[in-house]
């Protein structure tokens, strides 16, 4: 299982970026931004599973990433990769971190999102 801390460490090492927390109302929502233009390339949120149409109790961490529509359609499986929560559902996906194992795959999706949002 990949954690938000794993992602923060990865993006710091790979892109030199650190999360920021733009919403006082949601202090654990962490945006991942380009240092040059401040555009988001990722957003980590803690949400209730039912907000995503999932079963479960207690908040879960999700990672929103930008993704080309032709790829996001293939990735979405209704369990751990979903249409982007509170984002353009065609171009963004939400990844349920606790239900996702292959960190290499997630890191590849982060890299793709990083380049798509430059």
UniProtKB/Swiss-Prot annotation:
UniProt-listed Pfam families: YjbR (PF04237)
PANTHER family membership: CYTOPLASMIC PROTEIN, CYTOPLASMIC PROTEIN-RELATED
Protein name as it appears in the record: Uncharacterized protein YyaQ
Source organism per UniProt: Bacillus subtilis (strain 168)
């Amino acid at each position: 299982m990949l954690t938000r801390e794993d992602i923060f460490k990865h993006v710091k090492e790979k892109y030199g970026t650190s999360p920021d927390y733009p919403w006082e109302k949601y202090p654990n929502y962490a945006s991942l931004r380009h240092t040059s233009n401040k555009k988001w390339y990722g957003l980590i949120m803690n949400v209730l599973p039912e907000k995503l149409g999932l079963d479960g109790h207690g908040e879960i961490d999700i990672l929103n990433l930008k993704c080309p529509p032709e790829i996001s359609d293939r990735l979405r499986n209704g369990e751990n990769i979903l249409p982007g929560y509170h984002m353009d559902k065609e171009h963004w996906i939400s990844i349920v971190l606790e239900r996702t194992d292959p960190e290499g795959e997630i890191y590849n999706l982060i890299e793709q999102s990083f380049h798509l949002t430059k």
